[in-house]
């Protein structure tokens, strides 16, 4: 049965001489792998390579032949749903986008339907595309916190004089500096709490910090996810994020 859905490209792999296998995060079916036959072939009439539309992070409208429990699905049609202005061109925006996509690949199991997380990711990438690069510093932390919350690993509480620490194992702000609550310094705990309370991405730039504190918070968040999920492994894009976002 053919169905139309929105999709975000997570990964592409060459298959044969002219085809691709694409891993897509779809609105209706979660993460699925699709075979696109002949997409790398340059046609005589079009003189274009449609594989160029399938860059990592691309937002698509696709018509798919979906068969439950099949490991490799088939795409019948696809087109661009949103044309980026800077995400695939500007180094800072592209670095943040690639980090977000890699995090999704690490966290999302195949075929797990996550409609709310899909909608959030779609909006995150579009907002990122319209944001000045010098205002993106808190975006990776915000995206990581949001992914954790959508997948059921939300951190409870906020920073206060009564709860100045945060426990990585209990996922909560706490009054006690015991065990793993000392893993994040006070500046980091305050930054994490402030970003958690943001109601929109547009206000993230109002939260002032420095690159070292942001680095410590992002490292802490990834350690948090490693402890609370079975899917997290080393993030290849992490070192690039730290070097690009000052």
Question: Where on the chain are the PLM-derived regions?
Answer:
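Non-catalytic alpha-helical scaffolds and adjoining flexible linkers that form interface surfaces
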Residues: 1-246
């Amino acid at each position: 049965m053919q169905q139309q859905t929105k999709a975000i490209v997570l990964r592409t792999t060459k298959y044969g001489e002219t085809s691709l296998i694409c891993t897509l995060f779809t609105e209706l079916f979660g993460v699925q792998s699709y075979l696109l036959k002949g997409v790398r072939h340059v046609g005589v009439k079009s003189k274009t390579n449609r594989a160029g539309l399938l860059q990592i992070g691309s937002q698509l409208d696709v018509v798919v032949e979906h068969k439950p429990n099949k490991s490799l699905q088939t795409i019948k049609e696809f087109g661009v749903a949103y044309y980026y202005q800077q995400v695939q061109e500007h180094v800072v925006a592209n670095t943040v986008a690639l980090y977000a996509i890699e995090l999704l690949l690490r966290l999302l199991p195949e075929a797990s339907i996550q409609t709310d997380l899909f909608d959030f990711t779609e909006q995150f990438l579009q907002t990122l595309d319209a944001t000045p690069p010098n205002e993106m510093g808190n975006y990776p932390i915000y995206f990581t916190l949001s992914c954790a919350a959508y997948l059921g690993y939300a951190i409870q509480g906020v920073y206060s004089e009564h709860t100045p620490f945060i426990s990585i194992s209990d996922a909560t702000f706490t009054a006690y500096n015991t065990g793993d609550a000392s893993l994040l310094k006070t500046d980091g705990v305050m930054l994490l709490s402030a970003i958690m309370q943001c109601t929109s991405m547009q206000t993230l730039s109002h939260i002032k910090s420095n690159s070292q504190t942001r680095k410590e918070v992002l490292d802490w968040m990834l350690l948090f996810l490693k402890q609370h999920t079975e899917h997290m492994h080393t993030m290849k894009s992490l070192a690039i994020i730290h070097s690009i976002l000052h």
